[in-house]
């Protein structure tokens, strides 16, 4: 589906998982992957298999299946501040001026890099589990809409949005 558009692939983590059975222990591997095209599309997935390579491939297939599109402001940051949550992980994403860079910790950095976001400030609260952090970040990014979509939903023209919102969207 998005195969030709994928530019960046980040392997977030690989874990060895042990299942205890009657005859002893069975080992397998789980992998978490973030994919993106550096132009507003990103997805993540995880896979589990007996070999690391197979787990990575399953994670890639899973990530391709669940890619989302995120509107970017001037192709470099998000339109407005947003919050996301998944389980005990909470994230706050804030837009940033040009030249700020990606100020984010943990797995969030992989998502922003894959999306093509160059300037953003992100803070995580609660759990630092990478799976939850990625899910919380994507939940926050799913909430983003362009000012045009917001204005249409409210039945307004773009310049009729509140003055502060209009300035936010037009003064970098």
UniProtKB/Swiss-Prot annotation:
One Pfam family here: Ribosomal_S5
Key words, A-Z: Ribonucleoprotein, Ribosomal protein, RNA-binding, rRNA-binding
GO molecular function, one term: rRNA binding
Keyword Transport: no
Entry's Gene Ontology cellular component terms: small ribosomal subunit
GO terms of biological process kind: translation
Domain S5 DRBM: 7-70
Highest taxon in the source lineage: Bacteria
InterPro entries registered for this protein in UniProt: Ribosomal_Su5_D2-typ_SF (IPR020568), Ribosomal_uS5 (IPR000851), Ribosomal_uS5_bac-type (IPR005712), Ribosomal_uS5_C (IPR005324), Ribosomal_uS5_N (IPR013810), Ribosomal_uS5_N_CS (IPR018192), Ribsml_uS5_D2-typ_fold_subgr (IPR014721)
Quaternary structure and interacting proteins, as annotated: Part of the 30S ribosomal subunit. Contacts proteins S4 and S8.
UniProt comment concerning the protein's domains: The N-terminal domain interacts with the head of the 30S subunit; the C-terminal domain interacts with the body and contacts protein S4. The interaction surface between S4 and S5 is involved in control of translational fidelity.
Similarity annotation: Belongs to the universal ribosomal protein uS5 family.
Functional note: With S4 and S12 plays an important role in translational accuracy.
NCBIfam families, per database record: rpsE_bact (TIGR01021)
This protein's name: Small ribosomal subunit protein uS5
Taxonomic path: Bacteria, Pseudomonadati, Pseudomonadota, Alphaproteobacteria, Rickettsiales
The encoding gene: rpsE
